[in-house]
């Protein structure tokens, strides 16, 4: 059948595929042989194949089965023929071959010039067939392209070589090129790095726990159990490394280039030789004394006789004689020879040189009088400032012997061997390096530098001053019992009220006064002894004065002490005493007034209303005509007063009032309450936070910060002083300054520790007042009994990592010191860099730029 196809086929053109047609019968014959062999062992697989296969696959199988059946039939027919038929077919094939050769010779030679036999390459189907492998090439493969250079010459552009397929090192191992980056950086990624071409090296698949167990049981050759950090796979040893380990275990030579069995060269023989190498007899000169040595000996003997050479025994004798002579021959006035001490040797301290009073003829001012002599003799020897009496003699020969010389030498000897010695190394420190690098005060202007106005009129010392929120009126309170209001710019007195009659009451003083921070009401609170006067001075005009009086008068309707608001104490008096004894050592706690309202009365032995900590009284006709709108009476003398920023609350401090030392008063309801059940220590000052619901309470040695909303203790500051005098809070609320009676100014950073950030010691006496500027200027000042005011620049940065900057600017003095009391109070102008001070000399001063 194959032969017939060859005979009938015409001349093959390039568009046909004759090669595939010729190979197809060969494949069919191979398939026929395989089918004959497999027919005997054929299995029945019906029912095992899924009936839902595609129809295309069934058609392909049917087409493949049809030629196979035809070939099988033809093969069966051929098998039935006889040997004679085979011989006839061979003869026929030879005749057909001869006919084909003849037809090829008769072909027209012009056919060789046709397109079929042209040498020019054409883009046809056969051009893509590899003759050796009979495979079709990929049309996407790029070939060389011809271009031209700028000069017109031919330029051949070759396709790019793909390193993965075309280069010779395609079988090289893909090394990871991530460098020193740890492989843990790729834990959350699907790849473990990049190869030399920048392509990702994917993470090898990890088997299950069962696979890992099987791998640990069947250990392959070179297994280490380690993980390769570059590839992420298990690290295996190479054959060379395994061979090296084997040689080390068997103590073999690891380097093949070294020969352990090199030939040994015996440089010395082991046999003892009897006969000498040379048998020359000894010369006579070795047995006769040398003439040359005799000459040298005679020269040495001659030099010894002449004294040019000294024998060793005489040298020692001469040295001893010279030392004996030099022992008493020395220069008395030559410099002292310094001998270096041992490293562990500490020299004895030298005696101090004598002073003028130890002279035998001292000046007259060094001699003691009779009273000083008697006082010196009465004192014990330990308490005496000097251990001798200065005496005067006309000449040195009249000076007697010092009777205490032996005793002093003995005491010094005791001190030298009994007292321990310490070597103190001197520190070579530049003094300029200890001074902090601060900006110049000229760059930090403006700040007050001079006194521009003096407010005179008080007959006693001015204890307190305050300026209204608008910065126009200055109020002063003095020991003469009067409160005066001054116009700041002119120094003119515009209002005066006499609150204390000194003829009747000499004990009370005006301790403090302060304007309400709300400028629309014009209320001035004045503390006189146990009373607080709320005054609206007639200096503002009708609108402001009427607003202030209405705000105070509206609170009389809310005064319900003893009627509506009661605190019902359920426990008996005996239980209350026990509770107070148990809480004696606890810190201060705030009283929760809201919880008291919710408590319902219960049947008990004692039901008492809440005690009044202060009483509110309306003024009489005479007091109302003076501008007084309300009077608050407390239990003890009030020393400090501070307003809340909204102007409805103010806090007062009575140091002698024990558990009611701190009181909070509310104008709108005429209520006074004590926030603490008891106080530990004497309360010196109290202030509200500038914008948070917090209360700062300063006792004698510590400062506590309370949260009024949550009623808890937030922080406790430990200034480390004996007696605090006053505190003030920075307008931002993150810093606090405190003054003490032991001459210290303390700066606390509330974001840091409880100890002070800076402790300033520049005052000579007690610090009475210290204040921050409430405007936008970073200034603060402190006043003391030494009569001086110190102005400081204090910048607080927004960056929490930067510490505040404190720079001293100016020292102001002008007040006189009366009875060791200097300046009592300070206040800053709310807008300008002006400072007001009140002194014990009865004057108030304005310090301006």
UniProtKB/Swiss-Prot annotation:
GO cellular component term of the entry, any: PeBoW complex
Subcellular location(s) per record: Nucleus, Nucleolus; Nucleus, Nucleoplasm
Chain segments annotated as coiled-coil in the UniProt record: none
Gene from which the chain derives: ERB1
GO-annotated molecular function: large ribosomal subunit rRNA binding; ribonucleoprotein complex binding
Main location: nucleus
Protein source organism: Candida albicans (strain SC5314 / ATCC MYA-2876)
The name this protein goes by in its record: Ribosome biogenesis protein ERB1
Function: Component of the NOP7 complex, which is required for maturation of the 25S and 5.8S ribosomal RNAs and formation of the 60S ribosome.
